[in-house]
Amino acid sequence: MDLTIVGSDNTLPVSDVVFGREFSEALVHQVVVAYRNTARSGTKAQKSRSQVSGTTKKSKKQKGGGARHGALTAPIFVGGGVAFAAKPRSFSQKVNRKQYRSAICSIFSELNRQGRLKVVDAFDVEVSKTKVFAEKIKSLEVVGVGSSLLIVSDEISECLSLSSRNLPCVDVRSVQALDPVALVGSDVVVLTVGAVKKIEEWLV
């Protein structure tokens, strides 16, 4: 299949495996959930009654004082421990390499089918100015106001990185930094010709 290059009459032949396969919602959902869970720090921690600093002396005598109580570190008291206290743990989920690559291909194919995938010859700016970068995006006419844009380039220069980081709803990444969450969460994805070739080398 061929993809039309924005701002040109030329087309770019691409692999059907990457940009023309059937969309698998279940697979994409599984990979996205696993990716987001793996990104969790899992550092939540609470203290149980045995870990709270405090005396273990019986708070009052056993008889004649109403309900019977022991140490003030029990969960029932203010300042006491937490019942079933949470401990740091890993939320990471294993995803097979073949599954991950298939999900990325499925996302690219669906973006292409919906008309949300655009290809440009190259994307770079000569100066580190946000205004220049914004004008370049506007000249492409690929995204509306308020829409999120993901630009994937084979090489990211310092000028491109600096001029793009202050724009809301715009994310510039290299092929190596691609992930399923960024692809799914973007309204429009713009690929350079060089990025398309690297993506095909990675996924085919």
From Swiss-Prot:
Q: Which SUPFAM superfamilies match?
A: Ribosomal protein L4 (SSF52166)
Q: Which UniProt keywords apply?
A: Ribonucleoprotein, Ribosomal protein, RNA-binding, rRNA-binding
Question: Bias category Polar residues: which stretches?
Answer: 42-52
InterPro entries, per database record: Ribosomal_uL4, Ribosomal_uL4-like, Ribosomal_uL4_dom_sf
The entry sums up its family as follows: Belongs to the universal ribosomal protein uL4 family.
Q: What does this protein do?
A: One of the primary rRNA binding proteins, this protein initially binds near the 5'-end of the 23S rRNA. It is important during the early stages of 50S assembly. It makes multiple contacts with different domains of the 23S rRNA in the assembled 50S subunit and ribosome. Forms part of the polypeptide exit tunnel.
Spell out the NCBIfam families in the cross-references. Answer: rplD_bact
The name of this protein is: Large ribosomal subunit protein uL4
